[in-house]
From Swiss-Prot:
Keywords noted in UniProt: Hydrolase
Protein name from the UniProt record: Ureidoacrylate amidohydrolase RutB
Keyword Zinc: no
Family annotation (CDD domains): cysteine_hydrolases
Biological classification of the source: Bacteria, Pseudomonadati, Pseudomonadota, Alphaproteobacteria, Hyphomicrobiales
Catalytic activity entry: (Z)-3-ureidoacrylate + H2O + H(+) = (Z)-3-aminoacrylate + NH4(+) + CO2; (Z)-3-ureidoacrylate + H2O = (Z)-3-aminoacrylate + carbamate + H(+); (Z)-2-methylureidoacrylate + H2O + H(+) = (Z)-2-methylaminoacrylate + NH4(+) + CO2
């Protein structure tokens, strides 16, 4: 392996991907046909005033530009032939999937705690079929995209994500969405433990909590679990001559 070769999956012959993305801590290479763009939980609950995070006391005022950059990343991915995976976090209207007092989720979920404090919000927060659960209007899945519900922070927990990725030969996961320090990081970590290469487009994510949590999550990811880049670099890498080259 060349000393200056980018990080990323290599096939049995040692060939790395045709797309090289500038990233921290080093560039990473991937092929479009073995990569997916994952959009994590871009629901009204997490990105819109009046949604769960807002009602629970988290600041969602800066999510507008994040939504715009996710839309850019989705458009770039589709143009390059990269499949898009959308996650929606939540539970059935009776919250059976959320777990009862015997589950740590019952004790730690801020949505469940908010509804216990405010009973009038019951069956309105993160319940399937509600406005809160729905994706924001500006981001719409298209035919060919994959849309998956998930009942916990990680997109690998109790979902078919892993089998769907392996069936398609996917090796690289590019992440956008909310919240960087919760569901994005949890899913990327679980992907790392399953031998997937994880990349976060930092400016297409947003934290739940103060800005220091965004910085800490990204630092943790680039140091231990994956790579960190941005939407402009992703767009430029996908439109490069090298990216258009068909491997021999």
């Amino acid at each position: 392996m060349e000393a200056d070769a980018p990080a990323g999956y290599r096939d049995p012959s040692g060939r790395h991907g045709a797309v090289t993305l500038p990233a921290r801590p080093e560039p990473i290479a991937f092929d479009a046909d073995t990569t997916v763009l994952i959009v994590v939980d871009m629901q009204n609950a997490y990105a819109t005033k009046g949604g769960y995070l807002d009602l629970a006391g988290f600041d969602v005022s800066a999510t507008g530009p994040v939504i715009e950059r996710i839309a850019q990343a989705v458009a770039a991915a589709r143009a390059a032939g990269i499949r898009v995976v959308w996650f929606q976090n939540g539970w059935d209207p009776d919250y059976v999937e959320a777990g009862g007092p015997g589950s740590p989720n019952w004790h730690k979920s801020n949505a469940l705690k908010t509804m216990r404090r405010r009973p009038e919000m019951n069956q309105r927060l993160l319940a399937k079929g509600t406005w809160d659960y729905a994706l924001v209007d500006a981001l719409t899945p298209e035919p060919g995209d994959i849309v998956l519900p998930k009942p916990r922070y990680s997109g690998f927990y109790n979902t078919p994500l892993d089998s769907m990725l392996r069936a398609r030969g996917i090796r690289t996961l590019v992440f956008t969405g909310i919240a960087t320090n919760v569901c994005v990081e949890s899913t990327l970590r679980d992907g790392y433990h399953r031998e997937y290469f994880g990349i976060v487009l930092a400016d297409a994510t947003h934290q739940a909590g103060p800005p220091a949590l965004q910085e800490g999550a990204l630092r943790n990811i680039e140091t231990f679990f994956g790579w960190v880049s941005d939407v402009a670099a992703f767009e430029a890498a996908l439109s490069s001559d090298e990216a258009r080259r068909i491997p021999a």
